[in-house]
Every structure is written in C-alpha cells, then in structure tokens.
Amino acid sequence: MPAKLGYWKIRGLQQPVRLLLEYGEKYEEQIYERDDGEKWFSKKFELGLDLPNLPYYIDDKCKLTQSLAILRYIADKHGMIGSTPEERARVSMIEGAAVDLRQGLSRISYDPKFEQLKEGYLKDLPTTMKMWSDFLGKNPYLRGTSVSHVDFMVYEALDAIRYLEPHCLDHFPNLQQFMSRIEALPSIKAYMESNRFIKWPLNGWHAQFGGGDAPPSHEKK
C-alpha cells in the first residue's frame, strides 16, 4: 500500500520529500488548497499522529510529522543515511546546512521588511554559493557518486533562491551542473513535466516573497 503524504498546495517544507519519493517510491498525496483550513483542522486529530501537523507522512504503522523526520525516515529505508557514525554525522551536517540555506530565504520572505532585508541577503549570497560550490567540488552529488535526500534538500533551496536572484549560480558551473543533473533524473524529469508538480508558490500564500498566485515577472535561469 503506498505511503500517504499530506500538505498544503505549496512547495514549502514538503518539496524535498516529494522529490525524494518521486525518485524511488510510490505514494499518494492529500493536497490541501489555500482555503482548506477547516478541512485540515477537521482531520488533524483523527489520523493517529503523535504530534499532528502538516506535512504528515503515513507508511503503514509509521506515522510522522516534521519534514526532516520524514526525509530521514525515507532516506534510511533506502540506505542514504550512512553506515558508520562518521558517515551519519556527515549526513546530519549536510542536512543542517541545507535547512539553513532554505530558512535563510524563508526568514526574510515572511518579514514585512522584505525589501529592506533583501539587500543584505543578496550581498551575502555569493559567499554562501561559493561555500556550497566548494563543498560539492567535482562530485556529481553531495555525498559523492550516488543520489541521496540531501541532494533534493539543497536542490530545492537553490531553486527557490534562483527565483529571487536568477543569476546566483552564474559563477558556479558545478552548481549549475548539479541542478541540471537533478532535473534530468528520469523520474524527477517526468514529475516536473506532470500536472502534479507544484511550481508556485514557494512559501505560504501570505509570504512577502514566494507567496501569492504567480512567480516574479523575471524567470529563473
């Protein structure tokens, strides 16, 4: 029986989970539309979740909330977490840095002073991109030669950033190649070309950036 996901009809916290599942597992998703608040709250405490929230993930008797816990569970099922304490710690390090990368944009995206904060964010962005470029190096993926959940976390963060600054990867060809490599994975390519793929919004509908009903007038590269 396919696992079940539940989340709003946004990319938000769920998108890396969707990408990971599209890469290697069948699932069904309960999408909650913008005006489905009452629908969600009527079901919230009826799903058997220990800490009810969105996103949620139900795989037989395993019922989880919190996007990182969901990602780690799925990744662990597919041997992506590492087999030694050192490998697992390194994966955790990449996870934390990927969360920081996405939350850095999220923090300013919901702030009423977004336009003011954006200037400082963009000023620091090249340093952040260089850090990730140096970390990736000549490897095709962040853990070396095989795809893992952290690749989808970083892909999604970088893709969101490209909507704010379409040229952010111009000086980092290995990151450009990394993004193209993820997009070219057969199952990911098929998903992105399907009507199930959510292109927008990146964040909640009320966000100053990444919300609303349509992306910025400029398109990311």
From Swiss-Prot:
Keywords: Transferase
Catalytic reaction annotation: RX + glutathione = an S-substituted glutathione + a halide anion + H(+)
SUPFAM superfamilies (UniProt xref): GST C-terminal domain-like, Thioredoxin-like
GO molecular function terms noted in the UniProt entry: glutathione transferase activity; identical protein binding
E.C. code: 2.5.1.18
Binding site for substrate: Y110
Domain annotation GST C-terminal: ranges: 84-202
Family in the record: Belongs to the GST superfamily. Mu family.
Protein name, per record: Glutathione S-transferase class-mu 26 kDa isozyme 1
